[in-house]
Amino acid sequence: MAYIDFISVIHNSTTRDYLARVNNPDYPKAKAAKLAKQWGYDYWDGNRAINYGGYKYMEGRWEKVAREMVKHYKLPKNPKILDVGCGKAFLLYEMKLLLPQLRISGFDISKHGLANAREEIRDSLFIHRAQEPYPYKDDEFDLVISLGCFHNLRIFELQTALAEVERVGRQGYVMLESYRNEQEQFNLQCWALTCESFFDEEEWCWVYEHFGYTGDYEFIYFE
């Protein structure tokens, strides 16, 4: 299990006003969280107070991440990749552009997210919950990735999710929200609307070890 940095550059390119989000008079945090957890239009493309405020495909934004992943994991000639909690699956799309022979699969609980994925890969995506057994055989994928999904699960749901990533993938990569100090913990608690598992780095590493996950991991922080 190794820490590897793929996503933080993209994450840190966005400016966030933590107090403005938590003190928004039109969308108090409880109201915003309730809307966000419907995983529909509001979550992806609605008001910024609810989540992304417009999650659009931007050419090249995910290309560098895709290139670095392809290079790092030394994928075989006809690789298979699964994205757990893929959302609009822009990273899968960029990886497919780099490797036309790549066989991709992705699932999410958001109908809106999947419906707004790139048309070229939409047939490879489907509705499924990350905390339920995956419909695949052991070691079916050369790489299983999950970005910003598992912190939305409760602790007992993480056991199944991490075990399934370990089971169906020869290699794994999981990115989650975390914190290293009191300020980052406060910022995360202000910002996060769908997070169920608020753990620091050491706690997440304990969870990985306790539930038998041996793949790579990354944390994003709210500085």
Predicted segment positions?
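Hydrophobic adenine-recognition pocket in adenosine-nucleotide-binding enzymes
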Residues: 149
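Class I (Rossmann-like) S-adenosyl-L-methionine-dependent methyltransferase catalytic domain
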Residues: 1-73, 77-137, 153-167, 171-223
